[in-house]
Amino acid sequence: MKRPIVVINPNSNQSVTDGLGECLARFNNNKSHPIECVTLKNGPFGIESQLDSDSVILPLANFVKTRPDAGAFVIACYSDPGIDTCRSVTSQPVFGIQESGVLTALCRAERFGVIAIADASVERHRRYMARMQVINRLA
């Protein structure tokens, strides 16, 4: 049975989803776990604030509940919005790109760094890293 890895763009910007699909295409040769990129159509155009991040939590969880066929989910937004809520509504693995990126970096070095795309995002990312208990390893 094919169990896709569902990569969810939680904003409504289809060009972001298309870009994700293009970047992931070279990894999409696994016949048992194809990669499927989807757009959360009722999300904001971009996740630029805490309000934007919070506004997609329930729509993300509701979407995850509609996909019992998925082998895993990836929340493709660096804020990892709704990761805990999504994990609470499925038995499938749910990965966030911030959590996955930071933890992978820490497997390779004692400290890590992050380049944010907007100043307004920095504090939100720092709060999440503190919650992950890795803020003291931020370079």
Describe every region a protein language model picked out.
Residues I57-E110, V114:
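Glycine/small-residue-rich loop that forms an oxyanion/phosphate-binding "nest" at active or ligand-binding sites
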